[in-house]
């Protein structure tokens, strides 16, 4: 008699192994692609990809965008972001760490796992909370895999990513009248700093969800 197939599905946040080589290669869960006119996000309770909202304005995410499994922006992440940005009372945003993945391939849908190498990141403060965006390249990508650090990345690519995150929540009225932005990019950092940010978010995850507070 054949075995019954398993009906359980691995939760994209809690199931996959983040890294097996000290943050040189990362497992990434992709939520949004450049083709999406709807903002999708992982439903943390169920592990299903859900519609968050239609994209309000004309800008689209210029890269694959998602989260790093087994990361959580909590106390350690918030404290470190505040120290590095010289700002007080910065908290973690209580979400998985976000990641942007560069590739020349046309990946047209999310809800997938892929392997990518971190090359740097954006230190972002959103309404007083740490909201860093790790930037990575798809492993074995024919174009972007040559990039080893953020300093190797074309300025035009970084400009598009920064512009998206600075404006995707802003209304035309907000921009026309120059109202203070809730989102602030306070720094751009390279690979080693990105790995530090990932490590702290991984430790925050262990502190939050694992009974034994493991040191990594």
From Swiss-Prot:
First-tier enzyme category under EC: hydrolase
Provenance organism: Chlamydia caviae (strain ATCC VR-813 / DSM 19441 / 03DC25 / GPIC)
Assigned protein family: Belongs to the PPase family.
Subcellular location, principal: cytoplasm
Keywords linked to the UniProt accession: Cytoplasm, Hydrolase, Magnesium, Metal-binding
Enzyme Commission identifier(s): 3.6.1.1
Positions contributing to Mg(2+) 2 binding: 98
GO cellular component terms, semicolon-separated: cytoplasm
Subunit structure comment from the entry: Homohexamer.
List of residues binding Mg(2+) 1: 93, 98, 131
NCBIfam families: PRK00642.1
Function: Catalyzes the hydrolysis of inorganic pyrophosphate (PPi) forming two phosphate ions.
Annotated protein name in UniProt: Inorganic pyrophosphatase
GO biological process: phosphate-containing compound metabolic process
Cellular localization per UniProt: Cytoplasm
